[in-house]
């Protein structure tokens, strides 16, 4: 054969050989005529002829019935062996999900359509047909049900003892095919599916099953099992607790959380909350973004507790209402974690952090917030991936590498499954956030979220934020999160639900006292024993109020720390035994007093802390009883209005007059603005403990006594122009001027081409106590720790009107502040000014102690 001669197709060669044999058989059949029979039929007729010689009177039909019974018996035995799992004769059989077809023999090259053997066909012809890829006519297929077995049967009129029939039956047994149930089709391997699709020529149920299987497998993510060598350990804990937070006692921490909208924590070793941003060790750029652009002057309650917990490396579940600052709570720790990670390599696409969102709109909103923090840092790239957006562009961005991906679950699964899972490698994901996790589960994303979590490394840090905490979320958290910390912020749960809160606002003390008499008169009309407790802020006010109520005909009992123990015990006993009794007391009884009959608590002097308000109102509605807590509020008590707005429920506010609610909101908003600017501060706990706090208590007590005594003398209460402790609780007016620090920020060029900034802060002319407070070692060291600036005392102190006489003399006392950025210097001076304000307050307290009060 010549080299260029093409090779003969084996299939065509086999077909030509079959046609040649068929022509020879046709010629033999024509020669023998109609009496020509196949070898099998000849054997059958020969047996019949031999049997009819000795038994010519027997009916041929009886013999055929006998052979049919023998065939059925043998067939039954073969079926039983098959169902028992005897696969000795079926090693070469292949189970393929076909519909009523016989598989090929051991040496077959292709899978032909199975057909019933025809009576009268010779064995040679049947072998040729078995090897053929062509058919003379289409076979009639049996209807089938998924899971049933259809096989090629041997006709009952053939001799079971014939050798050729036995051989052919063996082939039939090998080629029997059992149909697969729909659920079994999904489990077939890819090579079997390929063989099935190649050999089938009809569109039956099997092909439909395979089409559904491919659709199902398209979105399925296989769980990734990581080995210990693949996962490099990473640091989770980046938080160092500030010294001023570490010094707080457990009781003070509990009161601090109570003042932060009743923050409740559950879990092992939860870090303490922070009070200001500088306690997190943030750089000046982020500090400016938080305080100036985002207007978070101080951390919100969820931020104050959640950020230290997340930065400590703990898995966190944060429950807080929308708009409470949850986004910043996870962005800051996420950025800190990414900065600590090894940068993405040339063949790595990322991400390092993943944020899952239930909706496109929320994902875009989170992406915008992340962009605000990363716009000045080219090393951190973020990408928003949501359904409905252009997938091609997202793929191109991922190929270039991204550190943060904000995505909806469905689109992230699409990205994970692209390119056989090679587009995104989840091995580098170390930080996962699920924002609005309750909505993720409400919208049915639980299966997708579970798939994603099984692909990410098991030692990841996971954070969930939600407005509610349904059972589905609890179950998910128990499976995915490791030893989580639960943080719940809900100021509306401060007060017992059985207590109805009320408030009345007054512009003068006399109207407030008249309202007190009105409410007490109503209690005396009750037929049932319903007692009343009136809380005041000092012992002097308690005694004055007791005398005035006695003069108005009320039987009252008074208890405060100034009375001896026996008198206090006697008054308490009489109060419990007197029907509709009235008790006037100070905060000494705000905790632990349990009198079930108390139905009304009147807070005559408004509470100044959340803890004080919670415990005073808690003296009513003991057990399953119901009660009322009434606050008589002066229009200057802004801190109390803020506490009431945080504590009162919406349905309670709706029961009040519109003018009262409007005034209360205005007072609360004014105090809230003062909190952000630093003009006001909210006292934590019950006002502090120890000798350091005695000055504040002393000042507050005498200020209130002065106002009350002026009222008793019939004089108008004069305004006391003294700053209230901690920024003005009680009387909010502050007429003390806070000196502004004199400084200028300058830039210095270094020989190596770098630049530094410095400022001279003049402190020589500050009052002595203020100057000491601003320049002492603890003040400067804390500012250095929070800002990273260098602060040095320079020069010496000169009395007022004096100064250096010549160039050799030291300059007037000042602080030299140095840093690499001007933002750090501005932050350090802001902190220094806060210390100056503390010094001014201490100076004023000394003046108050040195003066005598005159009426």
UniProtKB/Swiss-Prot annotation:
Domain of life: Eukaryota
Location within or outside the cell: Nucleus
Bias kind Acidic residues: ranges: 155-164
Residues bound to ATP: 320-327
Motif Q motif per record, residues: 275-304
Residue span of region Disordered: 1-164
Annotated ranges, domain Helicase C-terminal: 498-668
Reactions listed under catalytic activity: ATP + H2O = ADP + phosphate + H(+)
GO molecular function, one term: ATP binding
Helicase ATP-binding domain ranges (all copies): 307-487
Primary localization class, coarse: nucleus
One GO BP: mRNA splicing, via spliceosome
Keywords: ATP-binding, Helicase, Hydrolase, mRNA processing, mRNA splicing, Nucleotide-binding, Nucleus
SMART domains in the cross-refs: DEXDc (SM00487), HELICc (SM00490)
GO CC, any one term: nucleus
Motif DEAD box per record, residues: 435-438
UniProt-listed Enzyme Commission number(s): 3.6.4.13
Motif (Nuclear localization signal): 113-119
Similarity comment text for this entry: Belongs to the DEAD box helicase family. DDX46/PRP5 subfamily.
Annotated function: ATP-dependent RNA helicase involved spliceosome assembly and in nuclear splicing. Catalyzes an ATP-dependent conformational change of U2 snRNP. Bridges U1 and U2 snRNPs and enables stable U2 snRNP association with intron RNA.
Domain notes: The Q motif is unique to and characteristic of the DEAD box family of RNA helicases and controls ATP binding and hydrolysis.
Name of the molecule in the record: Pre-mRNA-processing ATP-dependent RNA helicase PRP5
Organism: Eremothecium gossypii (strain ATCC 10895 / CBS 109.51 / FGSC 9923 / NRRL Y-1056) (Yeast)
Gene: PRP5
């Amino acid at each position: 054969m010549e080299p260029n001669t093409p090779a003969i197709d084996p299939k065509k060669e086999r077909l030509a050989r079959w046609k040649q044999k068929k022509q020879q058989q046709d010629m033999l059949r024509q020669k023998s005529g109609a009496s020509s029979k196949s070898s099998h039929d000849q054997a059958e007729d020969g047996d019949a002829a031999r049997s009819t010689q000795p038994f010519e009177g027997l009916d041929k039909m009886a013999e055929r019935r006998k052979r049919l019974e023998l065939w059925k018996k043998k067939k039954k035995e073969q079926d039983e062996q098959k169902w028992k799992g005897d696969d000795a004769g079926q090693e070469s059989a292949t189970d393929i999900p076909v519909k009523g077809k016989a598989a090929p023999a051991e040496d077959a090259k292709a899978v032909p359509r199975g057909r019933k053997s025809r009576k009268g066909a010779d064995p040679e012809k049947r072998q040729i047909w078995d090897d053929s890829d062509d058919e003379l006519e289409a076979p009639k297929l049996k209807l089938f049900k998924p899971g049933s077995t259809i096989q090629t049967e041997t006709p009952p009129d053939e001799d079971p003892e014939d050798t050729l029939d036995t051989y052919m039956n063996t082939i039939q047994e090998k080629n029997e095919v059992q149909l697969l149930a729909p659920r079994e089709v999904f489990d077939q391997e890819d090579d079997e599916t390929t063989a099935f699709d190649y050999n089938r020529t009809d569109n039956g149920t099997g092909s439909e099953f395979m089409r559904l299987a491919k659709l199902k497998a398209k979105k399925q993510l296989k769980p990734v099992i990581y080995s210990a060598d693949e996962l490099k350990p990473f640091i989770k804990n980046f938080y160092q607790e500030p010294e001023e937070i570490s010094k707080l006692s457990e009781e003070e921490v509990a009161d601090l959380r109570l003042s932060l909208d009743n923050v409740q924590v559950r879990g092992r070793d939860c870090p303490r909350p922070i009070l200001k941003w500088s306690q997190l060790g943030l750089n000046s750029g982020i500090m400016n973004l938080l305080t100036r652009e985002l207007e978070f002057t101080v951390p919100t309650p969820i931020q104050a507790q959640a950020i230290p917990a997340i930065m400590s490396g703990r898995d966190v579940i944060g429950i807080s209402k929308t708009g409470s600052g949850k986004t910043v709570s996870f962005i800051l720790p996420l950025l800190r974690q990414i900065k600590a990670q090894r940068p993405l390599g040339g063949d790595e696409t990322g991400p390092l952090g993943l944020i899952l969102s239930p909706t496109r709109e929320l994902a875009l909103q989170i992406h915008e917030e992340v962009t605000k923090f990363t716009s000045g840092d080219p090393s951190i790239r973020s990408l928003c991936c949501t359904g409905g957006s252009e997938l091609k562009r997202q793929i191109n961005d991922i190929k270039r590498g991204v550190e943060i991906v904000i995505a909806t679950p469905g689109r992230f699964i699409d990205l994970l499954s692209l390119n056989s899972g090679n587009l995104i490698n989840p091995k580098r994901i170390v930080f996962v956030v699920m924002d609005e996790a309750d909505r993720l589960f409400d919208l049915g994303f639980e299966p997708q979220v579970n798939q994603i979590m099984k692909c990410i490394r098991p030692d990841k840090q996971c954070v969930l934020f939600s407005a509610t905490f349904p059972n589905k979320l609890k179950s998910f958290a128990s499976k995915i999160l490791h030893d989580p910390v639960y943080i719940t912020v809900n100021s509306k749960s401060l007060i017992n639900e059985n207590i109805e809160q009320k408030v009345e606002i007054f512009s003068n003390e006399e109207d407030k006292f008249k309202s007190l008499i009105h409410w007490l008169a109503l209690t005396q009309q009750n037929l049932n024993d319903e007692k009343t407790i009136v809380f005041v802020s000092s012992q002097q006010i308690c005694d004055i109020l007791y005398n005035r109520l006695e003069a108005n005909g009320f039987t009252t009992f008074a208890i405060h720390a100034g009375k001896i123990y026996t008198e206090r015990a006697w008054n308490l006993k009489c109060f419990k035994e007197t029907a509709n009794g009235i008790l006037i007391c100070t905060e000494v009884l705000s905790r632990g007093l349990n009198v079930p009959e108390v139905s009304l608590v009147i807070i005559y002097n408004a509470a100044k802390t959340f803890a004080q308000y919670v415990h005073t109102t808690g003296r009513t509605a003991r057990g399953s009883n119901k009660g009322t807590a009434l606050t008589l509020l002066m229009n200057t008590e802004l801190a109390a209005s803020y506490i009431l707005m945080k504590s009162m429920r919406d349905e309670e506010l709706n029961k009040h007059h519109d003018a009262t609610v409007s005034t209360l909101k205005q007072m609360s908003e004014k105090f809230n603005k003062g909190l952000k600017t630093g003009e006001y501060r909210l006292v934590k706990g019950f006002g502090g403990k120890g000798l350091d706090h005695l000055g504040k208590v002393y000042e507050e007590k005498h200020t209130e006594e002065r106002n009350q005594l002026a009222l008793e003398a019939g004089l108008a209460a004069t305004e006391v122009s003294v700053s209230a402790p901690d920024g003005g609780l009680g009387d909010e007016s502050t007429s003390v001027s806070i000196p502004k620090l004199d400084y200028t920020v300058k830039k210095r060029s270094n020989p190596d081409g770098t630049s530094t900034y410095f400022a001279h802060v003049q402190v020589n002319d500050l009052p002595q106590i203020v100057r000491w407070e601003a320049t002492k070692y603890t003040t400067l060291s804390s500012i250095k720790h929070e800002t990273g600036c260098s602060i040095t005392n320079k020069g010496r102190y000169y009395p007022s009107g004096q100064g250096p006489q010549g160039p050799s003399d030291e300059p007037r006392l000042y602080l030299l502040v140095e840093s690499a950025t001007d933002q750090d210097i501005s932050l350090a001076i802001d902190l220094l000014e806060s210390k100056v304000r503390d010094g001014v307050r201490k100076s004023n307290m000394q003046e108050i102690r040195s003066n005598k009060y005159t009426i």
